[in-house]
Regions:
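Active-site-proximal alpha-helix that buttresses catalytic centers in soluble enzyme cores
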Residues: 1-159
Length: 159
């Protein structure tokens, strides 16, 4: 049995969890398998009534539940622009803890949304360009700023 998780950093804002769930549901339809939404941290503190009555979950307890229910493979899909410390530090530590308890469970972690060392994948740029075009007013020349959360890690900001 396999369990697939779309994972973000986590937030105390309900809208962030609802958005992650929306994307996971859409992804489930595209890949033909259930993709579960989970955050690395924080989201489990959001009151359930703010996220549709279904408590938000963090990845650690979610993967342990799946392993207890017989999962032998965990696939983690990072919903991150680049290799933040959450992906290079916390996530491997958390998955190592899982594998200490469930050594038969194989864990695979996909690349973040942008892999600066891989081929130039411009799908995200095309998606953003489509979003800009949707907001254009005829006859105007927009000025566009692309802003993210930011990071002190050069590998993350390089993307």
């Amino acid at each position: 049995m396999r369990a697939i998780f779309l994972v973000d950093n986590g937030s105390l804002r309900a809208q962030a969890t609802l958005n992650l769930r929306r994307v996971a549901t859409s992804l489930s339809g595209l890949v033909g398998e259930t993709v579960q939404a989970a955050s690395l941290l924080h989201s489990n503190k959001i009151p359930a009534d703010e996220v549709g009555g279904i408590p938000a979950t963090t990845l650690g307890p979610a993967v342990e539940r799946c392993a207890e229910q017989g999962a032998t493979e965990i696939i983690v899909l990072p919903f991150f622009f680049g290799p933040s410390k959450a992906l290079t530090g916390y996530l491997p530590e958390r998955m190592a803890t899982l594998q200490e308890r469930f050594p038969h469970v194989k864990v695979r972690v996909a690349q973040p949304l942008v892999d600066e060392f891989g081929d130039n994948d411009l799908r995200l740029a095309h998606l953003l360009a489509d979003n800009v075009r949707d907001k254009l007013r005829p006859g105007t020349k927009p000025h566009v700023a692309l802003v993210d959360h930011g990071s002190p890690i050069p590998e993350v900001t390089a993307v």
